Amino acid sequence: MGRYHIVGRAGAGSLIAEFLFREVGVDYDISFPDPAEVKRADFHARNPLGRIPVLICPDGHQIFETLAIINHITTHFDGLAPAVGTPLHDRYSQFMALLATSIYPAYHRQHHSHYYAQESGFDDLRAKAVAEQAVLYDYIEFELAPYICG
């Protein structure tokens, strides 16, 4: 049986898989493809959108999208997430979905506005993204205090 292999890039969500593997003491390999490589057809066979991260599992199957990678790791290694079937796991799943479907997209709109609007609309787009994030961060702070940021 092989090892896990993370295909990553700084700032692209691959750090989360590294944190989880280190927490449970799992050895893994990691590579950082250059921008030209992620545009090639063979990389798109891993992820049709050409995005990073991708997790290549020991048996060879591949997983893309950070939330799916987190779900794989937390279900295969004990102690990383609450037990399935418990109210605490439901809450955990809710926060994971919130991060993946609301917080990260708002962050991306704020910092990568060129994907979503013409330059003339950047300021408005960014302001809306910041406002959306503020509501979400206030919610998380209320729900998870004192566990994050004191």
Residue ranges and their predicted role:
Residues L125-L144:
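Amphipathic alpha-helical packing segments from all-alpha helical-bundle domains
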Residues G2-L125:
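GST-like domain detector, emphasizing the conserved glutathione-binding G-site
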Residues G79, F142-G150:
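Surface-exposed helix-capping loop/turn segments at secondary-structure junctions
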